[in-house]
Design a protein with these regions (language model features):
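Catalytic core of nucleotidyl cyclases, primarily class III adenylyl/guanylyl cyclases
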Residues: 91-119, 135-168
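Short amphipathic alpha-helices in soluble, non-transmembrane regions
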Residues: 123-131
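Alpha-helix/helix-capping structural signal
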Residues: 62, 149-150, 194
Length: 278
């Protein structure tokens, strides 16, 4: 039941190979690179990483700049957490992805055969579809997907190390998310056109079966359509052909996440949990 508490409980996406995080993957698998470098200009540092083929799903917060201006800092903090919790729910439907990182305005999911996926691109599409079909609070994330070679590794200094993933697919997925035309559609997924190959939309996004009280199981009509390839100027990569899959049916949320975040801050203040310590 929704409510307010001062405790915190977290959960992690589980995969068939128990790689809940990139760190889990790196410490449990043979490294592609494991060396110490003594550079005459920057000094000594270690390089540890694994190269792999993967599909990146980038889901960015729509209107992040506007929200940051119109919401108070506390409201924005709550909005971001609501978005991330909702996103983690979507990633739970596919147990073959790893949450690469939470950014200030986006979440990156990583799919790979190394994590148990038979078709990483298809699995990423299924998670993206879930977002579009279950956007009850009108997050409308900007979604981009791209595949290719990435390097997962440790970065940092002797005081603190973190893990991350690097490579062209991350930039391409983020760019696809920002370059989708959206228009008057409920949600849109954008990706390089050549990744679609000869797939059929009806095979990829199969009809959802609903339980009708009188007619029993009934298949829902297809609400997604795929557009023709379109060329765009992609910074640093030249002309690229992209494709979009759009959900044409708008849901009717009873309340938006933007409104809900304001309500939560009001409740926090009314309960005396908002304490400024200047």
């Amino acid at each position: 039941m929704p409510g307010l508490s001062t405790g915190f409980n977290s959960s992690i996406v589980n995969t068939p190979f128990s790689y809940n995080t990139i760190t889990d993957f790196l410490i449990s698998q043979p490294l592609t690179i494991d060396v110490e470098i003594d550079d005459q200009y920057s000094g000594c540092f270690s390089v540890k990483g694994i190269e792999l083929e993967a599909t990146v799903l980038y889901a960015g917060i729509s209107d992040f700049a506007r929200l940051s201006v119109e919401l108070s800092p506390a409201e924005m903090l709550i909005y971001l957490n609501m978005f991330l919790v909702w996103m983690r729910e979507s990633s739970q439907i596919e147990r073959v992805c790893v949450i690469e990182k939470f950014l200030d305005n986006a979440l990156i999911l990583l799919f790979s055969k190394r994590f148990g996926s038979e078709d990483p691109f298809l699995d990423a599409l299924q998670v993206a579809r879930w977002m579009g079909d279950h956007d009850a609070m009108k997050f409308c994330p900007d979604i981009g997907i791209a595949s290719g070679t990435v390097m997962a590794g440790f970065t940092g200094t002797p005081k603190e190390y973190s893990t991350s993933v690097y490579g062209r697919p991350l930039i391409l997925a983020a760019g696809c998310a920002r370059l989708n035309p959206r228009g008057d559609v409920a949600s849109m997924i954008t990706f390089p056109a050549d990744e679609w190959r000869t797939r059929s939309l009806d095979d990829v996004f199969q009809p959802i079966e609903l339980d009708h009280p009188e007619k029993g199981k009934k298949k829902q009509a297809q609400t997604w359509v795929i557009g023709d390839p379109r060329e765009v100027d992609f910074p640093g990569m030249g002309r690229l052909a992209l494709r979009d899959i759009a959900n044409l049916i708008h849901s009717m949320p009873s309340i938006s996440a933007e409104t809900k975040s304001r309500e939560w801050v009001q409740l926090i203040r009314s309960k005396g949990f908002y304490k400024k310590n200047d």
